[in-house]
Amino acid sequence: MATPVKKWLLRVAPWFLPVGIVAVWQLASSVGWLSTRILPSPEGVVTAFWTLSASGELWQHLAISSWRALIGFSIGGSLGLILGLISGLSRWGERLLDTSIQMLRNVPHLALIPLVILWFGIDESAKIFLVALGTLFPIYINTWHGIRNIDRGLVEMARSYGLSGIPLFIHVILPGALPSIMVGVRFALGLMWLTLIVAETISANSGIGYLAMNAREFLQTDVVVVAIILYALLGKLADVSAQLLERLWLRWNPAYHLKKATV
């Protein structure tokens, strides 16, 4: 059994490396090894963050980016889940859908930005479309994979007990595929922010990406670093949220009990 000290160390261990990097960064800036034209000091970044926060500009851009990300993820994730269920549950569905989806998946969706701008302009629908497209494929693939890798013995046993159709799907197939689906959700959440960063830096007049590009034009490297750190923190927050959902929805899974016990 882990001692309180060991538990505390395990909790703070993920922060050792980031804190060490910031400490070295501050030291290099203080002694003049690192020019502020190349990279501002942590103190300068904190000052820029405070200034943007106090003016309300940062929170306005953050709210807009978060709204775009959530709407795009909801649309793309829902479509990916539905299409994955169709392909996973039906051989005919797989024959009709999978080849086309795999072809689209191999087209870099960020390469579609010029076409998307022509179709939608630079309004919200362009960013939401790109985020939805980026998040669709990880959830589709992992949903299909989860369904196709369910233990056939469990399915046959459930059928022998009289389960079929919707009850079989709810009680056996969906729980069996859920771990794989959640992996797809975590990948999709990472791609959600990655896609939005590029979309906002190319075709936007608001959002965190726009804030960074606007700061670049005026050589405000401290604001650029603030935007980068914000994206990193938002990505981490999304990943932690997905982990919490895994623990909530998969608390019946012995693998998660084992993981908790080892910690």
Enumerate the predicted regions with their spans.
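Glycine-rich helix-loop "coupling/hinge" segments at transmembrane-helix boundaries
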Residues: 117-118, 147, 194-231, 250-260
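N-terminal signal-anchor/first transmembrane alpha helix
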Residues: 1-29
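Generic hydrophobic transmembrane alpha-helix motif, especially the helices
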Residues: 102-138, 145-146
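Short cytoplasmic-facing helical segments at TM-TM junctions of multi-pass membrane proteins
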Residues: 99, 146-184, 212
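Transmembrane alpha-helices
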Residues: 129, 133, 166-198, 222-225, ...
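Periplasmic/extracellular loop-to-transmembrane helix junction in inner-membrane transport proteins
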Residues: 3-4, 31-74
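Transmembrane-helix boundary motif in ABC transporter permease subunits
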Residues: 71-101
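C-terminal transmembrane helix and the adjacent membrane-cytosol boundary/short C-terminal tail
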Residues: 91, 148, 179, 183, ...
